[in-house]
Curated annotation (Swiss-Prot):
It is an enzyme of class 2 (transferase). This is 3-deoxy-manno-octulosonate cytidylyltransferase. Its main location: cytoplasm. Activates KDO (a required 8-carbon sugar) for incorporation into bacterial lipopolysaccharide in Gram-negative bacteria. The gene is kdsB.
Length: 250
């Protein structure tokens, strides 16, 4: 089975313009993401809509493909990139361009989901720990996931799901395992073509979570598990946290 990694990277981010080109420990954020992915998948490309990002990727020796500025989601950008790249890839892996510390173990966990021939789409979760403050669970920028017994996603929400009616909130993390969604997706190539042709759904628009479009249309999302904490960079403040993490790790 052949896996193609695509890293969507936009220049015009609302909260952090030029984020992929921000420097982190002497390298751009997009270079760090690319280097984490290279070698784990059969091939990897950055998919961008900006010539500055294209030039930066070529400068460090990475592969890059130009895509439209009109895409509403990273999945749409992945599909255009996939059609331009070509090849006989079975699965396309969508790696967030703002996750410079994505780990090989996480990519391998998503790949393992496709050992099940019925898997259409796969993603990752990380369990919240019982000692985390309740505010972490309440964070609307950290979507939660509920799963069925077969490790398929039932629903994703920015709200806390499930709501424990008969327990104090301070005890929720002790009485139930909550899962944080990690925004790493993989799709069988033919499924990627299908889901990008779907119109936006009511649940997707309500939560601003594109994966709800797929669930609402009957697609199954297989979930792999990771114990690695991710550090996404959405704001300049997040970049400072990433710099501290990098210093402490070295």
């Amino acid at each position: 089975m052949k896996f193609l990694g695509i890293i969507p990277a936009r220049y015009a981010s609302t909260r952090f313009p030029a984020k992929p080109l921000a420097m982190l420990g002497g390298k751009t954020v997009i270079q760090r993401v690319y280097e984490q992915v290279a070698g784990i998948l059969d091939d990897a490309y950055v998919a961008t809509d900006d010539e500055r990002i294209e030039a930066a990727v070529k400068a460090f020796g990475g592969k890059v493909v130009m895509t439209s500025i009109d895409h509403k989601s990273g999945t749409d950008r992945c599909y255009e990139a996939c059609t331009k790249i070509g090849g006989d890839f079975d699965v396309v892996v969508n790696i967030q361009g703002d996750e410079p510390f994505i780990q090989p173990s996480q990519l391998n966990a998503v790949k393992a989901c496709f050992e099940d021939p019925t898997t259409q789409i796969a993603t990752l979760v990380k369990p919240f720990t019982a000692d985390e403050p309740f505010a972490v669970l309440e964070n609307v920028n950290s979507p939660k996931v509920v799963l069925n017994k077969n490790w398929n996603a039932l629903y994703f929400s920015r709200s806390i799901i499930p709501f424990q009616r008969n327990a104090d909130k301070e005890d929720w993390l002790k009485g139930h395992t909550y899962y944080k969604h990690i925004g790493l997706y993989a799709y069988r190539t033919e499924v990627l073509k299908e889901i990008t042709a779907l119109p936006q759904s009511s649940l997707e628009l309500a939560e601003s979570l594109e994966q709800l479009r797929w669930l609402e249309n009957g697609y199954k999302i297989k979930v792999g598990i990771s114990d690695v904490e991710t550090i996404g960079i959405d704001t300049p403040q997040d970049l400072k946290h990433a710099e501290e993490f990098l210093k402490n790790r070295s």
